[in-house]
């Protein structure tokens, strides 16, 4: 099945705003790193500032297609470190971590909800919906400014389908399932293959996949060219070492025949 988000140009996905933004220190970090990431061709997913190891700044990013390789993390880290040193959004020492969104990733943009329709999600609302703030169910897609969710925690069919306004969502993320793991692996292989292709380091195709003109159907079914006769060029000379020649040579040695006769 074709991913509808794959049809959107990368520049539009890079410009797509996030639905959930961070407060406080994380917001200051976001204002510094988001333009740099966009200029490099990446999208900011989330920024988390924690007290781990004194202070840790975790920056979660991705390519427009949702993929992320270790080489991407290394490139982003090298680009952001000097920028953050100059901007100095944090007034103390900190540890910088660059990571991918992961399999059970947060959903922070409209395209995230569109891309992961059909998967199990957990949603926490900033504004209560029908007296509830937490929902869990199968994401059915997006309708206007809301996400469609089929809840799996209710027995009443009439209450299973809900529409949650995206602007009122505080946090939404995928739930780890076998189906999600399989989908993530498939996307990862495709992204890795495309990256290698862009870098020109794709391995050679297997022997049976090579385009061998001699084995192609067109070559096998083509009429064979007519061959010119080469009988004259390959005409054999009469042998000179037959039994008759050997007997004549012996008679010549004994003087029984004239040399001219023995030729």
Swiss-Prot record:
Biased composition annotated in UniProt, kind: Basic residues: 217-231
Keyword Cytoplasm on entry: yes
Xref: Pfam families: DUF150_C, RimP_N
UniProt subcellular location: Cytoplasm
Source organism superkingdom: Bacteria
InterPro entries with a match to the protein in the record: Ribosome_maturation_RimP, RimP_C, RimP_C_sf, RimP_N, RimP_N_sf
Any one GO cellular component localisation term in the record: cytosol
This protein's UniProt keywords: Cytoplasm, Ribosome biogenesis
Positions of region (Disordered): 192-263
Ranges of compositional bias, category Basic and acidic residues: 232-257
Principal location listed in the UniProt entry: cytoplasm
One GO term (biological process): translation
Record family assignment: Belongs to the RimP family.
Function as written in the Swiss-Prot or TrEMBL entry: Required for maturation of 30S ribosomal subunits.
Official protein name in the record: Ribosome maturation factor RimP
Higher taxonomy: Bacteria, Pseudomonadati, Pseudomonadota, Alphaproteobacteria, Hyphomicrobiales
Protein encoded by which gene: rimP
